[in-house]
């Protein structure tokens, strides 16, 4: 909290707050809880379209899938905790987002985990990577919610740090919707789940400042995961919701009981009384302050009518969950805490829930600049990029996740997007994307590119995009360059979503991601939902005897590319998003899939065309011959054509008889070769640039465990 904020609080209250009141105010006025630095910009984002039932403002967003089914989606970060204690930090990140979905009245059905680390050469980064993955795997597997996709990337700027974002999706029937706020006084507040301990005390305050070198001291701010209680909480909560007697529901995440109760009561102008001494404790001798701001996990707060308390309580007892009435809602908009009969806090509730925004100084920076494309042999360029940890298969990661529990997973990890079966005819596509290298060079274009890539990934599995959520990972907003990059990012996210007719239904902002004065790159992560006809999903890999077509225009855009990163080249221009072309190509590919004209589709993104072709060869265990000189392009340099990361592009493989019909769907569309054989062959004007057996490509592609010191 800043000195001017403390002064404002004293003025509005007309007195000095006591220790408990200061603790609650510090939690609620933290960046993590209040979004005080991001709110002025987030209002630029579009939040409504024909699919949106509920936009931002509650624990998760809701999208209409069909008349019987609504989809609930949210995304969260657990960056600071995971950097300090990777296993517990990542596991509790999963638990928190699952409860966000649950408290809308939905059953969580799938997770995505976009995760980022420093270079794997360093032991500390390998340790963070292995234990973050283990934390996500253990928690998700034990609660029975499959992790079906995500991203795993490595970057110098994250040395000794980690970004752990987790998205979750759930499904519900419309009649089971429960809001996170009350609309009447006199409701009883029931706390259910785990006992309250000292873990996570000051967790949101810890998440609202930079990490120091001595991170071990911060371990007490990391919460302790208990997936077995969470599993019981999921089933008990849904059973309680299905009675129709739950009036409001919130999970206890950041800010603990203070945040959950004040937000639940204050949203519509009511107040709350909390009897903190009734809270079941895990540790003896806890103070009212510790009880009110503890972030112990696996806890939910229910609001029910007094006459329904026993019925709801019986459901919790069936699941052997401890529950207690810890307070009630009141007409007067105040937040009052009692401890053993004594009033120990009494604040106007809006002082907790309506935090003034802060607009920091904005200072543009320029990281872009003209750079000569290095003169590098084609084979060396390909080997560098194909062998990059960012390009390698993440099978080592997702094989630790039970991605098939619940039996809905139609498309498994490794494809452009995951697909989950919702009914016999339709599936839900779910994907997350971001590119910090592009965002660092040009935050506006990088953000637009993240949205465009999400759309391409959804389209590549035949899905019509429905809605988006965003997770914005940045360094300190007090740095003028960082705050400018944040504002530019939000502008890019807004413009791209509007162009596609998409809305953001939920999101998360994580500031202060830096270690010892070293800020991370701007890292917006966008997750998208789409609706797909199950029988129309194309393959992601090649099969024998098909033509290979490239959709879209390739430009000499190597700035922020995987090739430049591997060669250590800085600068260049980030790829520019042409929204009209992006939209037209997406519509064309969707139409081609609907008409059954294409067998396989893959979008072109990180690593460029060469990587996309090689991935399709490995996925289908089938070779190809492709002449890159035929690619629709604004450059005649083979390196630029092969490794540029221009947007708006797809590779399609299809039977020759569909060629004429396909040509009519696109402005830029050219046949560059054929599938077949056991080698991947790249040509330029008929001359061979590179020939690699698909078996060799596959061996390299699956070599991530070797970088971790594990033998296959």
Curated annotation (Swiss-Prot):
Active site annotation, chain numbering: 32, 78 (proton acceptor)
Binding site for substrate: 77-80, 99, 223, 295-297, 510
One GO MF term: magnesium ion binding
Single GO biological process annotation from the record: 'de novo' IMP biosynthetic process
EC main group: ligase
Record carries keyword Nucleotide-binding: yes
Chief place where the protein resides: cytoplasm
Subunit structure, as described in the record: Monomer. Part of the FGAM synthase complex composed of 1 PurL, 1 PurQ and 2 PurS subunits.
NCBIfam families from the UniProt entry: FGAM_synth_II, PRK01213.1
Protein name: Phosphoribosylformylglycinamidine synthase subunit PurL
Phylogenetic placement of the source organism: Archaea, Methanobacteriati, Methanobacteriota, Thermococci, Thermococcales
């Amino acid at each position: 909290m800043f000195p001017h904020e403390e002064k404002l609080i004293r003025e509005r209250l007309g007195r000095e707050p006591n220790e408990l009141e200061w603790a609650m105010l510090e939690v609620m006025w933290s960046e993590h809880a209040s979004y005080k630095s991001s709110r002025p910009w987030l209002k630029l984002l579009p939040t409504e379209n024909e699919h949106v039932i509920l936009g931002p403002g509650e624990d998760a967003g809701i999208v209409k899938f069909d008349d019987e089914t609504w989809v609930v989606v949210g995304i969260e970060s657990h960056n600071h905790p995971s950097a300090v204690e990777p296993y517990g930090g990542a596991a509790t990140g999963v638990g928190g987002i699952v409860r966000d979905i649950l408290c809308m009245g939905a059953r969580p059905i799938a997770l995505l985990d976009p995760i980022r680390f420093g270079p794997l050469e360093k032991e500390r980064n390998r340790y963070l990577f292995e234990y973050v993955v283990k934390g996500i795997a253990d928690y998700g597997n034990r609660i029975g919610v499959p992790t079906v996709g995500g991203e795993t990337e490595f970057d110098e700027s994250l040395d000794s740090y980690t970004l752990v974002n987790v998205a979750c999706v759930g499904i519900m029937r419309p009649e089971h919707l429960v809001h996170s706020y009350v609309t009447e006084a006199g409701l009883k507040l029931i706390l259910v789940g785990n006992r309250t301990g000292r873990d996570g005390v000051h967790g949101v305050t810890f998440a609202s400042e930079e990490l120091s070198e001595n991170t071990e001291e911060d371990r007490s701010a990391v919460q302790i995961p208990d997936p077995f209680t969470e599993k019981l909480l999921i089933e008990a909560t849904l059973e309680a919701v299905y009675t129709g007697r739950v009036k409001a529901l919130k999970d206890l995440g950041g800010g603990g009981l203070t945040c959950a109760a004040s937000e639940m009561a204050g949203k519509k102008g009511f107040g709350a009384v909390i009897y903190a001494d009734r809270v079941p404790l895990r540790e003896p001798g806890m103070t009212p302050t510790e009880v009110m701001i503890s972030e112990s996990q696996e806890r939910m707060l229910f609001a029910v009518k007094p006459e329904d308390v026993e019925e709801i309580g019986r459901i919790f007892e069936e699941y052997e969950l401890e529950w207690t009435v810890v307070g009630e809602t009141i007409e007067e908009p105040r937040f009052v805490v009692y401890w053993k009969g004594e009033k120990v806090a009494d604040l106007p509730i809006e002082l907790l829930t309506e935090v003034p925004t802060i607009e920091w100084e904005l200072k543009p920076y320029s990281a872009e600049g003209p750079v000569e494309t290095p003169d590098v042999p084609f084979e060396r360029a390909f080997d560098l990029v194909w062998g990059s940890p960012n390009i390698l298969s993440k099978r080592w990661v997702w094989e630790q996740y039970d991605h098939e529990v619940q039996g809905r997973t139609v498309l498994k990890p490794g494809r452009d997007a995951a697909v989950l079966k919702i009914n016999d005819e339709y599936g839900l596509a779910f994907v997350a994307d971001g590119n910090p290298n592009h965002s660092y060079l040009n935050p506006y274009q990088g953000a637009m590119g993240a949205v465009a890539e999400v759309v391409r990934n959804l389209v590549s599995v035949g899905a019509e995009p429905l809605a988006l959520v965003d997770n914005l990972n940045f360094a300190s907003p007090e740095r003028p360059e960082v705050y400018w990059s944040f504002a530019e990012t939000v502008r890019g996210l807004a413009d791209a979503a509007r162009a596609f007719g998409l809305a953001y239904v939920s999101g998360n902002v994580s500031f202060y991601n830096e270690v010892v004065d070293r800020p991370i790159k701007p890292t917006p992560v966008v997750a998208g939902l789409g609706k797909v006809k199950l029988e129309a999903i194309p393959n992601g890999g090649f099969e024998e005897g098909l033509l290979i077509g490239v959709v879209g225009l390739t430009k000499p855009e190597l700035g922020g590319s995987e090739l430049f990163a591997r060669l250590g080249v800085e600068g260049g221009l980030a790829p520019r998003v042409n929204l009209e072309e992006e939209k037209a190509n997406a519509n064309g590919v969707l139409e081609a899939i609907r008409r059954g004209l294409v067998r396989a589709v893959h979008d072109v993104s990180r690593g460029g065309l060469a990587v996309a072709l090689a991935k399709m060869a490995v996925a289908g265990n089938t070779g190809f011959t492709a002449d890159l000189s035929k690619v629709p392009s604004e450059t005649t340099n083979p390196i630029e054509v092969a490794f540029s990361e221009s947007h708006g592009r797809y590779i399609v493989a299809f039977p020759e008889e569909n060629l004429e019909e396909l040509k009519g769907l696109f402005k830029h569309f050219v046949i560059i070769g054929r599938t077949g054989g056991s080698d991947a062959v790249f040509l330029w004007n008929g001359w061979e640039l590179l020939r690699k057996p698909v078996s060799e490509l596959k061996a390299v592609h699956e070599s991530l465990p070797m970088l971790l010191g594990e033998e296959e």
